[in-house]
């Protein structure tokens, strides 16, 4: 398979050195994203377009390559092509006919040609000649340049002809690694996951910072969704997941801060801690998922007071977004189901939260707060590469594993729905249910407690983690299914 990758249009208007730098970075990212599928992958070109070639012919692997490229920042679109020596107009027609003859009978079509280089014909000459012959020789219904049912596409570069047989839209944005880095404050809900996606889509490498308010299940859920976002949109770069234990901070706020000021002060403590983390990692900006007036702490007045806790730039990509638009984006990128099933821990709930915080009042309340507690939280923070976070979590978890499922037991396939659909799990003589890992904790209590359940995933890590959590919650009827 050969692909022609067209870069994000904004890259093409950069100065020559910057343009070359961005396109070179995109080439590196494409190699990194596809290397595990094809170590022999070839990526060439440094100016207008990149050419990607693979000798693989497995349809599943090729489909996975296509999906990964669609989600790689920096790509405007890419084309699946077949390359031929140019030849004359009749030769061009024959190559197009080979690929499009089966699609044209009874159809209205148009021919589109893009051309670069010196030739004895123009792009319009090619379109007219090829269109006329295909209409006559392929039993097409006619030609319509405005609303064709089929488009015959080709590109000509010097003495090379590329017949296009598939076109895929890319993510746009700049290549990850070509711009600065950010630290995203992650709660795992709709807003923070979409905010992270927006920054990555634009081309900013985004690390993840989670403030654990006291729920182990919540921490696990946020790790899972952060790993998902990175794997789908940012896998070309190494990023970190930082978890800061904030239970003591919450306790101090509950014990010493006026109820109406709790939410604003908690956000200020998070910004202080995130700033320290970012400075240590030499990251230049923080990112949150806040939108104007979505909740009481997000009025303009409150946001200004919250931001005064740090000198670092705080970016809010969703600031003017409607909630439904955010949910729609989360659905599109695959994080909505994570958010819907995310365990929550609300330790700071104001009965009458202020919508107009005043700086002097906040300073007075914070004077009661023991800042040594915030320092302890930062000292106890954990930091892991995002690609190892799930493995590290499961490393010391001990759960009974079984190699064989028996009649009467139920195997629960907890893989992501895409993986379960691509390769359905079949265990002869045993019932198999599909329940994605992100919904497992909420849905498990609805299952028959008199049955025994075996959790299954590809590597056994996610199933061990969730089995361990369910056992700690008092569900004794859980094991891990690891077929030989």
Curated annotation (Swiss-Prot):
UniProt GO molecular function: ATP binding; CCA tRNA nucleotidyltransferase activity; tRNA binding; tRNA-uracil-4 sulfurtransferase activity
Quick check: keyword Ribonucleoprotein in the entry?
Answer: no
Catalytic activity, as annotated: [ThiI sulfur-carrier protein]-S-sulfanyl-L-cysteine + a uridine in tRNA + 2 reduced [2Fe-2S]-[ferredoxin] + ATP + H(+) = [ThiI sulfur-carrier protein]-L-cysteine + a 4-thiouridine in tRNA + 2 oxidized [2Fe-2S]-[ferredoxin] + AMP + diphosphate; [ThiS sulfur-carrier protein]-C-terminal Gly-Gly-AMP + S-sulfanyl-L-cysteinyl-[cysteine desulfurase] + AH2 = [ThiS sulfur-carrier protein]-C-terminal-Gly-aminoethanethioate + L-cysteinyl-[cysteine desulfurase] + A + AMP + 2 H(+)
Question: What compartments host this protein?
Answer: Cytoplasm
What InterPro entries does its record include? Rhodanese-like_dom, Rhodanese-like_dom_sf, Rossmann-like_a/b/a_fold, ThiI_AANH, ThiI_fer, ThiI_N, THII_Thiazole_biosynth_dom, THUMP_dom
Q: Detail which positions bind ATP.
A: 185-186, 267, 289, 298
Protein family: Belongs to the ThiI family.
Q: In which pathway does it act?
A: Cofactor biosynthesis; thiamine diphosphate biosynthesis
Catalytic activity, EC: 2.8.1.4
- Originating species: Ectopseudomonas mendocina (strain ymp)
The principal location of this protein is: cytoplasm
Question: Domain Rhodanese, which positions?
Answer: 405-483
* Extent of the signal sequence: none
Which biological processes are named by the entry's GO terms?
A: thiamine biosynthetic process; thiamine diphosphate biosynthetic process; thiazole biosynthetic process; tRNA 4-thiouridine biosynthesis
Q: What is this protein called?
A: tRNA sulfurtransferase
Question: Which cysteines does the record link by disulfide bonds?
Answer: 346-457
Q: Where is the active site?
A: 457
All residue ranges annotated as the THUMP domain in the record: 63-167
> GO cellular component annotations, sorted alphabetically?
cytosol
Keywords, A to Z, come to: ATP-binding, Cytoplasm, Disulfide bond, Nucleotide-binding, Redox-active center, RNA-binding, Thiamine biosynthesis, Transferase, tRNA-binding
